[in-house]
């Protein structure tokens, strides 16, 4: 955009950052070397050069974050310099909506990062935020997914809890289904619910959801439908949905579920929290002896996939390009800072070399029974292929899962679920004209 390419006269003294929770705020305050002081209420951060960082945090629920961000970006040109958005954060599921717009700066052309600055990052994290070769965001984290399983249940069902051996039993979907039958015979569920395996299938489609105005349902998604219907009918799952209370308790001390598909943040934060008998909020410690802490391990599972991730975007019209460049350099390209974040927080960071170093070290996770899970993540991260991502992914994936839930529970036949999916997406996206199903 014209606003973006005009040279800024002088750096502004206010840096406005928009996000939906405090995750990036804490990464910034803890690891950005230019931080001088943080306000008691955390609403502002002061940098060493006197710049005031103003945080605007709007929760994600009901599209609230995107709606408020959209309104502010529409008013960006007329806003006073100190009120203009300088940096805003986006998630993978809707990244392309912003990346493919005039509101975002090219991290190389406009902001000034170089190919060599970005060379250490995982390719898929660059692909997700690129349009026609123009990279328009950058991230400090990579979020490869793995299959997290209960060691004690694996021992009972497979005779081993060793991650390399367990992987040989789960290395493709046919084998995975065989283990589901074995687990059921011992009184265990293979998965908690309908959605658990969805991303592993949807990240491995052979073509994008939408070409022109045609929606193509990939064969791999129908494999998920068939598998989930079979698991539901045979009692291999607990009919839970992602994030519901059944799903959470299935991960805890009373759970009887073999495992969960989870990415980096999910294992270190969600799964760990759910595994404890006494939550940390009630004084419980993150240690062996509290619930099933230490009884999980991870293996690659049937297919590589990713789940989640947060990208930093520079906003067109910002008068803080030098500061934005430095934030991106330090928080997404600096190998030493990336490594430190992982060592301190277990968040998996976007630097291949730093992660390889930890992968080859004696680093281990007590939560995962002493396993070095970074080694598996490092292997998985290079296999993620996001060439089929598109701007409709979030909406179509949600509608697809919702439509087929009624089929899994026996409320409708498969043909009705297909028709309901078509109706739902045409309401959501009137511009999409037809839907093609696999033969």
Regions found by a protein language model. Give the residues of each.
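Hinge/lid segment of periplasmic solute-binding proteins
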Residues: 6, 77, 90-146, 283-300, ...
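Periplasmic-binding protein-like
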Residues: 27, 151, 328-358
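Extracytoplasmic/periplasmic substrate-binding proteins
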Residues: 33, 223-326
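A local structural motif
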Residues: 40-61, 80, 160-166, 229-244, ...
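Helix-loop-helix "hinge/cap" segment bordering the ligand-binding cleft or interdomain interface
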Residues: 108-117, 126-197, 209-242, 316-322, ...
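Long, aromatic- and glycine/proline-rich binding clefts that accommodate carbohydrate-like moieties
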Residues: 291-294, 342-402, 406, 434-439
């Amino acid at each position: 955009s014209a606003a973006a390419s005009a040279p800024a006269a002088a750096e502004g003294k206010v840096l406005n950052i928009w996000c939906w929770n405090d995750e990036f705020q804490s990464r910034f305050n803890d690891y950005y070397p230019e931080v001088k002081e943080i306000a008691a209420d955390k609403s502002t951060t002061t940098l060493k050069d006197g710049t005031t960082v103003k945080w605007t945090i709007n929760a994600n629920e009901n599209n609230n974050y995107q709606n408020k961000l959209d309104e502010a970006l529409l008013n960006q040109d007329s806003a006073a310099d100190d009120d203009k958005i300088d940096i805003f954060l986006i998630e993978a599921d809707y990244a392309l909506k912003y990346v493919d717009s005039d509101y975002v700066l090219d991290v190389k052309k406009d902001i000034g990062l170089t190919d060599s600055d970005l060379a250490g990052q995982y390719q898929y994290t660059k692909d997700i935020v690129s349009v026609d070769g123009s990279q328009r965001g950058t991230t400090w984290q990579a979020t490869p997914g793995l299959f997290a399983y209960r060691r004690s249940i694996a021992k009972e069902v497979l005779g081993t809890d060793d991650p390399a051996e367990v992987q040989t039993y789960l290395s493709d979907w046919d084998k995975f289904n065989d283990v589901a039958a074995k687990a059921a015979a011992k009184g265990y569920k293979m998965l908690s619910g309908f959605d658990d395996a969805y991303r592993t299938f949807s990240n491995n489609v052979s073509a994008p959801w939408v070409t022109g105005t045609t929606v193509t349902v990939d064969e791999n998604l129908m494999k998920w439908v068939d598998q989930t219907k079979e698991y539901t009918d045979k009692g291999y799952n607990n009919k839970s949905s992602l994030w519901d209370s059944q799903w959470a308790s299935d991960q805890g001390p009373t759970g009887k579920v073999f495992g969960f598909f989870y990415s980096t943040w999910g294992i270190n934060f969600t799964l760990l929290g759910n595994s404890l008998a006494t939550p940390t909020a009630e004084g419980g410690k993150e240690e062996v002896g509290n619930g099933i802490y230490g009884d999980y391990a991870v293996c690659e599972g049937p297919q590589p996939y990713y789940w989640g991730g947060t990208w930093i975007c520079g906003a067109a019209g910002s008068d803080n390009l030098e500061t934005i460049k430095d934030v991106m350099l330090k928080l997404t390209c600096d190998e030493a800072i990336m490594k430190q974040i992982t060592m301190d927080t277990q968040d998996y960071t976007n630097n291949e070399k730093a992660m390889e170093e930890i992968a080859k070290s004696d680093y281990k996770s007590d939560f995962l029974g002493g396993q070095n899970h970074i080694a598996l993540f490092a292997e998985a991260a290079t296999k993620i292929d996001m060439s089929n991502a598109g701007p409709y992914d979030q909406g179509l994936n949600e509608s697809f899962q919702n439509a087929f839930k009624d089929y899994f529970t026996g409320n409708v036949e498969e043909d009705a679920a297909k028709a309901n999916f078509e109706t739902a997406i045409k309401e959501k996206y009137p511009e999409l004209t037809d839907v093609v199903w696999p033969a």
